[in-house]
Each structure stands twice: as structure tokens, then as C-alpha cells.
Amino acid sequence: MQALDRRRRGERGSAFGNFLTLLLLVGLIGLGAYLYLRPKPGADAQPAQRTSEAPPPGEHGGKTADEMPDPIEPVAGTPALEAAAPYVPKDNVLQIDISEYAGYGGLIVANGGLAPSPDSFFAKQYGFQVKISMSESETWSPLNNGRLAATATTVDALAVLGRSFDAVVPLQIGYSRGADMVVVDRGIASVNQLAGKVLAASQFNESEFFIRYLAGEAGVPVVVLRDLDASPVPGKLGLVFYEDAFVACDAYAFELGSAAPRLAGCVGWTPRTEEVVEGSDGRAKVLVSNRNLLVVADVLAVNRAFAKQNPKLVEGLVHGILEGNRLLREQPDAHLATVAKAFGWTEADARGELARVHLANLPENRAFFAGTMDSAGSFGGIFQSAVLAYGSVIKNPADPARFADTSALDALAKRNLYGDQKIAIAPIKTSTGAALEGDPLLSKDIRFFFEPNSSVLAKEEPKNLEYLDTIKRFLQVSPGSTVLLRGHVDNLRVPEFRQQGGEPLVKSMALKAMELSRQRALAVSDALKERYKDIDASRIEVVGRGWEEPAGTDSDLNRRVEVQWFTLE
């Protein structure tokens, strides 16, 4: 009661006090209105003329700092899966789970939709039906635990899951061609320039693998940060993880609107990546997509125990998806409606999404698993690239042969099915001008071993062969890409030349250094063409830079051949 009485006394007050209070309130309201309405520093008064230094209010849908997406706690190590158990079909119907992605359109066409159907390819040709479910959450555990017959995943995920994933892979469904993107601040020109920056990503999917793969090829170490309060690590690319790739891009879009963004980009997939760029007022761009970088391969994963007990059913799944892929490749207009209905898209949307995938046929599948694919990543190549990209995250890597099972593909080939099909993967070019006119996607310094003071490669040095394989992989996984070999020599003796003969001798020796560096780059080019007869010589260019661009004070590092990789976008 005593407290209540005091409050009442304070409420009454004097008339003069009330008058002063009223004046104070009016003054505060006026000041607030002035501060709100006056032009913001660094921004024009007219909304249409706002500069990138001061993003327009409400750019992020009126979201406040409290509404910014929160990072998730990163998983240490690899994902834990439920215990392995065999899948048992019910009523002769196989349960398969996919995500909303046009690359799985062949399965839908073969099934005539999502629901089990006696009119499906599977029912008519092999006597079983398929029920297709769609979820965006990972389905590795349900497959492992016997709740699914099969699911769609990517090769890189298999490397992460390792021996705990009790599945076999009998089929490549296709390649993603443009769906995965790295979006960055406008001023970032290459993957190498991501060192010391932080990107938003999602963990253990193809988007994380994509950026880890690129960073690894550029020689930029990756470090996982718990949140945006962690300081960027000099010389390393920091990754902050979000619930999924769309949320990661939401976080980057939000940060773009702040005065001091803590994110330099995001890794995700369409359409969210493109929406972020379009809404950035020119502050963001697509650094690279996988349109012509074929390292994201979708595959069918089948419960191992089920596959072992039912090889004919697995053959039916493989055959049906290949047939659906054929129909979508050869007669897309006749089957767009089926795909669109399953995903809740318009036919125009379905057509656009299908343009971002390459649906694999039988000969492409056989080359994919055999490692003879010349214009894209192979099963073993992508698997091992993922092991290298994830590094210490994968404590005990599995062998890719643990998963690959080509018996169904071999059986179809013996039946002489799809004999008219050919491997048909070509570059998709959307911009004008030669690739070498722009910035390289990344550059990689390689220290080839040469005979002393010459441009002759040391033939007995095994490292040289490994380095040649590295350059070949660049050309293999990216149709239409080119490499520029830039030779460099050491500048250690420049002071000695200057002392001996002044600037005239320095200039004379600089010309010789330029020619030696060019000859060394040519030697690498010739060795590539000799080792890999199928390489198109027009995709390799050379230049000598002499001692003009030292990597530092280390003489060994200065004697190098720099490989710049230009991809088509």
C-alpha cells in the first residue's frame, strides 16, 4: 500500500510541473521527427538516388537486427547416422525420397508422378511400384535404418559419411549445371581473394563442398567459425554455418545492408543466390557457378542390404531413371507437365530449372564410374576431391569402391540398350569474349622441378607428374575452361647483376630471365600435351614473366609456374 500511495502522489503533481512536462514531451517529439526525416549521412534525399554506402531503410523487408538469421553450432567431425538395417518393401512398393530439384525429373517421368502407379515404367517393365516423397532435410539416416529403399544424394556427401553409410550407388542421376553458386562482394575477383574473408554456408552438402573444393585448389585454407563475432583469420577463408543454404544467403543479404558487413558472401543455390545479387544494388555478384564446373554429381543411393537381396529391383530402378532421363533429354515438351505438377511449378519454371542440370545417360554413367569421363568429374575423382577438400574433418576416409556398384549398368549394357547414345557434355557459354580476357577463377603456384639452370623438366621427379595431373583435372572438370601457364624465375641475383654491370646488365639479364621463364612454361605445356593426348592445345596458353612478380623472399617459391584457371560463365 505504501508504494501504491507514492505512485499516486507522483501522478498528481502540480499544475506548473505538468506544464513543464508537456513542453518537454513536445520538444522530444519534435527532435525525434527531425532526426528521422533529415537526410542520412552518405545518402541522398531521394530514395531512387541512394548510394551503396547507405542502403535504403527496409531493404531487408523491414527486418531488425533481432531478425537476422542466427548461425547454427557447427557439427564437429562427421554426421552421426542411425544404425544400419535392411529395407523391406511393403505391398511391392518401394519408398524413395528426393528434394525439390529438377535433376530428379527423370525418376518422376518414369514413375508418372510421385504416387505409386500400375502404369509406371517400373510397374510395366519390372513388376514393382515406386512411391516418391519429397523432403529438404537429409535422408541419410532413414536410408541407413531401412525406412527408405533409396534416396538421392551427391558424391561429395558419400566421402563425408564414409563407412557409417551402409548404401550402394548403382547410378549417376546427373550433374548440377548452374544451380550452385558462390556470391561475393563486388570487389572480389577470384577465389584467392577470399583469404581473410568470411562466407555464409550450410554444412555437409554440395554447397560446402563446392567452396571447399575451390579454396583447396587455390591454396586457401578453410577454417570453420562459430559465429559472426569471431574475427576473420588472416590468410584463411572462414565459414559460418546456417540452417540451410537459403538461410545462409539471407544472412549475407542482411549483412549487405549494414555499415560494416561481417560477411563477404554466401554459398548456396538458385533461386536465392540470384535474388541476393539482384537485390544488392550492385554490391554483390556471382563469383562462380557450377554451370561449367562439373564437380557436383547427383547419384542414387540404395540401402545396401536391400540391394544385395534384390538385384533385379535395383536394375529396374536404374533402368527406369535412365529411361526417364532419355525422355526428358529427347522430348522435354512432352514431359514438362509431369515434372511441373510434381514440384508445384509452372511449365516455364520446370523448363528453366531443367536447363540447370545435365541428365546422365548410359554411356555417361559407365564413363563416370570407370573414371574415363573427359569433360566432367568422375565418381572416384569427385569422391577423392571431397576427401581432400574436407581434410581433417574426415578422420578415416573410405574408399570410393565401397559405394560404387555398376552391376545394374553392366546388365543393361549387355542387353544392348541405348546403343545409339553418346557422351554429350559440352560447355555452356553465356557471356561474350574469350575466357582469358577476364579474371581467372583462381590461380595456383606449382613448383615444377627442372634441370639446373634450364627449361628441361626433371623426368625422374615424380612430383612433376602429380602437378601435371592437377592441371589436367582443371580442364577435365570444367568444359570450355582454359589454363594460362605463367613462368617465373628467382630475382635473387638482381643486386649482383647491378653491382657487376649496372642497369644495362640488369636489363639484359631481365630479358634472358623472361625467356627462360617462358621456356619453362612451354615445357610444362608440352609435357601436358604429351601425357594427355586428348587435350585440346587451344585450351593451354603460356607467358613468361621473368622475375617481375616474385612470390616473396624464398628463392624456391619464386622459381615456379603459376597456373591461372579461367572458366566460362
Model feature map: region roles:
Residues V155-A157, K236-G344:
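Pocket-lining segment of extracytoplasmic ligand-binding domains
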Residues F403-L484, L492-S508, D534, D556, ...:
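Periplasmic peptidoglycan-binding/tethering modules of Gram-negative envelope proteins
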Residues G105, V109, S141, N145, ...:
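Solvent-exposed, polar/charged alpha-helical surfaces in well-ordered, non-transmembrane soluble domains
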Residues R50-D244, D250, A264-T270, L287-R291:
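Short, glycine-/small- and polar/acidic-enriched structural segments
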Residues N310-P397:
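Secondary-structure end/capping motifs
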Residues L94-Q95, Q129, G196-S202, N303-K308, ...:
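Second-shell loop/turn segments in exported
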Residues R6, E11-E138, N144, N361-P440:
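N-terminal hydrophobic or amphipathic helices and topogenic motifs
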Residues P479-H488, P504-P550, R559-E569:
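A non-catalytic structural micro-motif
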